[in-house]
Amino acid sequence: MANHKSALKRHRQSIKRNLRNNMVRTRIKNVVKEVRSAVEANDTELAATALRKATSVLDKAATKKVIHARAAARRISRLSAAVNKMA
């Protein structure tokens, strides 16, 4: 365990950031699942609204550097392709 005051503070901060980032990643997984399930169910309206929500969540995560910007773009692109293929 760290002995310096600054190292202890950095450790506390990293724990907080880790919890926050995990919450964001969980949110990403859930919204992506919503889109995928709507596509499988062939529900066009639900898929479109879920895609909008997923795009927003992925872009926010990329902006906050929780996931890489290109990773977010790739996931949005693949989800959009799946929804467009359905329509």
UniProtKB/Swiss-Prot annotation:
RNA-binding keyword on record: yes
Gene Ontology annotations for the cellular component aspect, listed alphabetically: cytosol; small ribosomal subunit
Region (Disordered) residue spans: 1-22
Pfam families: Ribosomal_S20p
Cited InterPro entries: Ribosomal_bS20, Ribosomal_bS20_sf
GO biological process terms held by the UniProt record: translation
GO molecular function, one term: small ribosomal subunit rRNA binding
Coiled coil: none
Sequence ranges of Basic residues compositional bias: 1-19
Keywords, ordered alphabetically: Ribonucleoprotein, Ribosomal protein, RNA-binding, rRNA-binding
Source domain of life: Bacteria
Purpose of the protein: Binds directly to 16S ribosomal RNA.
Protein name, per record: Small ribosomal subunit protein bS20
UniProt source species: Maridesulfovibrio salexigens (strain ATCC 14822 / DSM 2638 / NCIMB 8403 / VKM B-1763)
Upper classification of the organism: Bacteria, Pseudomonadati, Thermodesulfobacteriota, Desulfovibrionia, Desulfovibrionales
